[in-house]
Amino acid sequence: MAVKTELPILDVTLRAKKHARTKVALAMAFIEKLKDLRFEDISIREICRDVELSEGTFFNYFDEKIDVVNYYLNLVDLKIIWKARRKGQGGDRLALIDRAFTGLVEMVISPNLVSEIITAMVRQKESPQKMAISPLEKRYAFEDCPGIENEPTIRLEDFFHTAIEAAVKNGELPGRQGVEDVVVSLKTILVGTLLAARRDKTNRDLNYHYRRQLELLWKGLGRKEL
């Protein structure tokens, strides 16, 4: 029998629904602009006009523009992890990471969006933090992902850390490498390959490059098949 993942209607107020829908709408309108514009050139006034809100309403949801990017990245991480977990339930933790990279490729929808997000992140003095995202916001952001509202909010970096720890524990990886070192390698592959693949003259797609870099990493670390 299928498990129902719908939030109980009586447990959700109209105010909560409106808040969640508005926050997601603002974020998605901002990201839509970022596909074509520079981060600095995006006007909060225009974003609010697009979603039919007063300009001041924006600040009820986000303190500044960079918070929208952080929020979107948290949503992207959420969907990537949700898909990776749904596509396989075995004990192979490295395969889970491989699937996460495949999911990331599916989320790369615009070269300019990727460049602007990376640039905005580099300018931040601190690493992006995990943001509070309600179950309603998760559902409204990804209405085609049943049950995603039940997925815990976790950054991809933390997901990698947990998966590598489990991979060492279950014997997929030898314990001689530090978990943090492997996570740094994964983050380097994630961002570096994303940028390098744009200049690849062989016309190979991003998924190929990610698969290749992960294969090289796992081989170098001494991956063992379960």
Model regions: which residues?
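Conserved phosphoryl-transfer catalytic core
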Residues: 79, 83
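Amphipathic alpha-helical packing segments from all-alpha helical-bundle domains
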Residues: 125-170, 180-184, 208
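Helix-turn-helix
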Residues: 25, 33-71, 75
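Short, hydrophobic secondary-structure boundary micro-motifs
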Residues: 43, 115-119, 176
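A short, Lys/Arg-enriched amphipathic alpha-helix from helix-turn-helix/homeodomain DNA-binding modules
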Residues: 20-32, 78, 129, 158
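Hydrophobic alpha-helical connector segments
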Residues: 71, 85-124, 183
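Secondary-structure edge/capping motif, primarily at the C-terminal ends of alpha-helices
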Residues: 87-88, 118-132, 193, 197-201
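C-terminal peripheral helix-coil segments that are non-catalytic and often amphipathic
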Residues: 1-9, 106, 158, 162-170, ...
